[in-house]
Amino acid sequence: DPWSGNGSAQAGDLIKVDVGCLVNGYTSDTGRTYVLGPPEDLQARLHDALMKGFIAGSALLAPGIALAEVHVVTQDAIRAAGFSDYTRGHFGHGLGAGLGSEEWPFISADATTVFEPGMVMAFECPWYITGVGGLIIENQVLITETGHEMMNSLPFDLIEV
């Protein structure tokens, strides 16, 4: 079950870490995936597909780009990496109301919003699979006048612990 469990982590288990903080009224949201011991082949392939989606979608994070376009490109990249049935309602969201809060605007297929300079978004590529676990690559992103700035420097790798 990717959502919960009542046992201890075992070798091969994925550890999805999705964290944030609240400082002076500003919230953050970042996520990474770890694996206890060496990753299984499927785990590595899933993470690689999410990374391809993250890279493809990130390339479009700039003023004037429709959030819906980022959704399409991100999902298409993950599907092209060998997972044609992958579907996700959104690949990110606004920040600000509180920790653990996913708020408008959403990077979704039906979004009508376009990115503007000064927007701060959480851009994410998650996947939750029963029998495998939960994976996520997520960064907080500032939309700048000319593109975007990732707001942390954590590694994106599937990290073995």
Question: What is each PLM-predicted segment?
Answer:
Residues 1-161:
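Active-site neighborhoods and metal-handling regions in enzymes and metal-associated proteins
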